[in-house]
Each structure stands twice: as structure tokens, then as C-alpha cells.
């Protein structure tokens, strides 16, 4: 484990050095993400200028859900975004072969090879929103510790779904479109799912479970809803999807044939 931790830090340092050679691109990337999320919030604020609440949720509560959703999304984007490369080109162009010739677990290698520093824009917006809305929560030490525990489990859902959909490329040669389609559902996690119809609520809760990355844990923090379902469900679903994604990865790896073969 320590060996992999050291290697991860080495990859991060090397990638940051590469990024710093193009400082303008870095700044533009971070600002682009920051402005995108800012415009979404501005639009939401305009809506609340005309209505007092949305399905019983105040603007401050929805802002908390929105901010909460950006933290796990941003962490996954920051550390594990290279899975997009697997789905889009590594298998199709035969570039995945190099990962099989190195004395490193290929999944670990792909996960830590890049460091998407523009994700700092998402984390910055998420942090600001949480900092400005936490006053709406009656914090206790157990609740604060639960909050800290929720973040890695919610991040794991993002990463697991990307591992699973990227692994489809082992059979189809590319799966970038599938990753994108699944990833689009994360936008629904930024808002209370009670505003959606029952079919969509079920879909984003148990099939593409992005609702557990923000809405359900936020429901516990904001409204003291059932901790077993909202927090326990997050942990159970994230671990279940992680195991499923690893199984799919292993089967795909066994089925892998180089694009040149």
C-alpha cells in the first residue's frame, strides 16, 4: 500500500510540473469550470426570485446540496479522470498495451497517471457554497464526522461508475459515449430529487446512483432524515458498485485484445 501511495505522489508531482509549463491553460481551465458552476447557480437564484421554495426546499438548502455534490465530483475529476482516456482512445488505438508491460497494476496506473487540476474550480465553488450554507445545519460532532466520511464514499460512486463504463471498451474498443451518457446523470444530483418523477428518482437512486452522492446525505444533514438509509445507503451502494466495477474490469481485461492483433 505504501508503495502505491508513493507512486501516486510521484505521478501527481510529475503531472503538476507538466501543467505548470502551460500556466495560461491551467488558469483558463480552472476559471472555465468555476464560471460554469457560477452561471448555474445564478440561474437557480433567478428562479428563486420568483418562487419562495422548490418542492419545500429553500434556496439555501438547495445551494448546500449543490455544493455538496461538487466535492465528490471534483475529487473524482481531480484524481481519476484518466478513465475517460481508456474509454475514448487507449483501447481503440492500442495504447493500452503499455500498461500491461509495466510492473504496476494497470487500473491503478490509469487512475493515477493524470491529475486534472482544473477540477479545483469545482472544488472551490463547492467549498464556497458549503461554507456559506452550513449555518442552516445543527452541527454536532457525530454529524460532522459523518459528513467527513460521506465524501470518500460519494467520490467512490463517481469513480466506480467510470471504471464500469470505461471497461466496456475492452469489448467494444471504445466506450467514451457510454461514459458521457452515464455521467450526464450527475447533473440531477445537484438538486432535490423530489422535483423529478418517480421513474427518474428510482433511476438516479439505484441504477446510476448519483442521488447518493449529494441528495440523500444532504437530506440527513439538513432535515435529519433516516441516517440508516441516507448515510448507510450511501456506504452500501458505493461499495457494491465498486465491487461490481472491479469485477467488470477484471472480465474486460481477460477479454482484451490489442487493436493491432
Go through the PLM ranges and name each one.
Residues 1-261:
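Hydrophobic transmembrane alpha-helices and immediately adjacent juxtamembrane helices
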